[in-house]
């Protein structure tokens, strides 16, 4: 967009030479001055007007089709002419803007706009003095379709003018003005949506598959656990690859890999059980790199002021992916058979990958279409360095905040995996819901987590924006993520009605989602250059907690009760709270 004030300093019959000065805006002030002229006492005078510019670069997409932004009343005006208080500016696509001082108090018509020639003003004298000396009574604005280059209009058509050019930015449709960093965030969101859709479809499809192939419960458990063989394998490796080769390459590889494994799952099942186990492990390999790669790419793209919101949005993609997978898998299976769910969900990965290759880059410095303004904004809150060539393991493992991440991730995932894995059994055996009701109620915690994760992200970024230290914000949010579930699981042992039990479950998972603005955001705080490796380390501990916690719950239930299961989780939540508040930090400890 180009903004300018078209000013005439005297009578329109007076010539205005091309020596009229054009000043770029500085400190939101625009200056326009005319060449020296002689007043009635033959003294040489120069008229200079300074305008205060307000918010012309901050108009929203809706305001782009309305009058927006303003030239304020002049701060300095060396002439005695009166100028009205506001100069309005219209901000429209592919239009150039001129603000006119109306000089015809009788006819009140627009001054006919002249064309610009590469931001210069070609002025010539008017042949005849057609205008009287005006008293400038108002300011008007008019937007026209303009050519950037072109010959000046005839001096008989337009008075001599001085053009002040304020700013030049290409105006484009709103979808092209959408911040590139949030485009990357949304693509990561959809990758995590697909991640959990492809993961949970087996939990539904395993029922007709076990009937068709005659699998025992032990075999079903083996198939379900085979995913974690590959998932554990690539947690740390995914972080190393992402920090070395870039998050775009690694995340793209992961989505393609697990999508192919998903599509090939029906074929592997029909060939034989060993092939199915290998295919599920392959799928785990692909999904294992997703979180470290995402953490790497967002550490470069998202400034700290937006970190919590962006990560909360991405992780809510996982929760909504579970909801989507649990909702659509039964429909596809009942209509087209169990293989259809693998074909349908797996094929979506190719659509995502095409968009990823076109729109995403590993860092802002690699994106040729990124605007200078957005690049400055991003670099103001993040650090871009050369790709990592070697991992300083000794340095990383010597830092207490790193161990705070690892221990807290373990404590967090123990309770989370227990609730999400054993919840249908609890609803069925303890609360006496039937299988259909249990399945529907299992969706509720995922929805609750998706909602509260984004609420927590907004709160965290708001606190950071208001000057609260990042360390305190991370400790506050993670304390909620630990103590909230501990409180509601304790209450769960006391309630006597199914409705209250379901409410406690939902509140437990909702408060758990505040962890996305706590420990899940902290990897980028303490070591943005090694964000992928750090998440790989802590998430390895988290996955191990899920595996051991799920198995331990079965053992506890054989010897004890559900109260004992919840008590173990509560103890670990409290341990995690203490470790986190003592050893964690929001400051960078790894360069």
From Swiss-Prot:
Does this entry carry the keyword Plastid? yes
Q: Which GO terms describe its cellular component?
A: chloroplast inner membrane
Q: Which domain of life is it from?
A: Eukaryota
Q: Does the keyword Acetylation apply?
A: no
Residue stretches spanning the membrane: 184-204, 220-240, 249-269, 271-291, 313-333, 336-356, 402-422, 440-460, 475-495, 531-551, 565-585
* Transit peptide range per the UniProt entry: 1-76
Mode of membrane association: Multi-pass membrane protein
Q: What is its main location?
A: plastid
Location of the region described as Disordered in the Swiss-Prot/TrEMBL record:
1-38
The UniProt keyword set, sorted, is: Chloroplast, Ion transport, Membrane, Plastid, Transit peptide, Transmembrane, Transmembrane helix, Transport
Q: Its biological function?
A: Probable anion transporter.
Q: Which family does it belong to?
A: Belongs to the major facilitator superfamily. Sodium/anion cotransporter (TC 2.A.1.14) family.
Protein name, please?
Probable anion transporter 4, chloroplastic
């Amino acid at each position: 967009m180009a903004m300018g004030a078209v000013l005439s300093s005297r009578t329109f019959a007076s010539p205005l030479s091309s020596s009229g000065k054009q000043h770029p805006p500085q400190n939101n002030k625009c200056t326009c001055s005319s060449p020296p002229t002689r007043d009635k006492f033959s003294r040489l005078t120069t008229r200079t007007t300074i305008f205060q510019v307000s918010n012309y670069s901050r108009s929203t997409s809706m305001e782009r089709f309305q009058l927006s932004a303003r030239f304020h009343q002049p701060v300095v005006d060396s002439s005695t002419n009166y100028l009205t208080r506001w100069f309005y500016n219209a901000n429209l696509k592919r239009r150039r803007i001129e603000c006119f001082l109306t000089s015809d108090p009788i006819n009140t018509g627009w001054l006919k706009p002249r064309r610009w020639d590469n931001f210069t003003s070609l002025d010539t004298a008017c042949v005849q003095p057609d205008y009287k000396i005006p008293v400038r009574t108002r300011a008007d604005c008019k937007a026209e379709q303009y050519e950037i280059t072109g010959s000046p209009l005839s001096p008989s058509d337009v008075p001599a003018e001085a053009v002040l050019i304020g700013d030049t930015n290409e105006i484009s449709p709103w979808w092209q003005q959408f911040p590139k960093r949030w485009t990357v965030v949304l693509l990561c969101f959809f990758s995590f949506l697909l991640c959990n859709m492809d993961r949970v479809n087996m939990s539904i499809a395993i029922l007709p598959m076990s009937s068709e192939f005659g699998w025992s419960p032990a075999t079903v458990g083996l198939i379900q656990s085979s995913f974690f063989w590959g998932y554990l394998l690539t947690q740390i490796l995914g972080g190393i690859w992402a920090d070395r080769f870039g998050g775009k390459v690694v995340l793209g590889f992961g989505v393609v890999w697990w999508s192919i494994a998903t599509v090939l799952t029906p074929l592997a099942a029909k060939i034989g059980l060993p092939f199915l186990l290998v295919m599920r492990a392959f799928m785990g390999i692909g999904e294992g790199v997703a979180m470290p790669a995402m953490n790497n790419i967002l550490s470069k793209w998202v400034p700290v002021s937006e970190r919590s919101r962006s990560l909360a949005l991405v992780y809510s993609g996982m929760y909504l992916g579970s909801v989507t997978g649990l909702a659509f898998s039964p429909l596809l299976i009942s209509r087209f058979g169990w293989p259809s769910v693998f074909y349908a969900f797996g094929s979506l990965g190719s659509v995502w990958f095409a968009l990823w290759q076109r729109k995403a880059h590993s860092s802002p410095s690699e994106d040729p279409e990124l605007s200078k303004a957005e690049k400055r904004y991003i670099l103001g809150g993040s650090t871009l360095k050369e790709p990592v060539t070697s991992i300083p393991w000794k340095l990383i493992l010597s830092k207490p905040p790193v161990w705070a991440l690892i221990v807290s991730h373990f404590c967090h995932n123990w309770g989370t995996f227990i609730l999400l894995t054993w919840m249908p059994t609890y609803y069925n055996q303890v609360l006496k819901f039937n299988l259909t009701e249990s399945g529907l109620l299992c969706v509720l915690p995922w929805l609750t987590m998706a909602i509260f994760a984004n609420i927590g992200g907004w709160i965290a970024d708001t606190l950071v924006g208001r000057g609260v230290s990042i360390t305190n914000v991370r400790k506050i949010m993670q304390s909620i993520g630990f103590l909230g579930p501990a409180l509601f699981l304790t209450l769960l042992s006391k309630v006597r009605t199914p409705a209250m039990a379901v409410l406690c479950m939902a509140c437990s998972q909702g408060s758990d989602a505040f962890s996305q603005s706590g420990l899940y955001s902290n990897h980028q705080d303490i070591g943005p250059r090694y964000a992928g490796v750090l998440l790989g380390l802590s998430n390895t501990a988290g996955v191990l907690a899920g595996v051991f916690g799920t198995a331990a719950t079965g053992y506890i239930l054989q010897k004890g009760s559900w109260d004992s299961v919840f008590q173990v989780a509560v103890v670990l939540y409290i341990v995690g709270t203490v470790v986190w508040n003592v050893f964690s930090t929001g400051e960078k400890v790894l360069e």
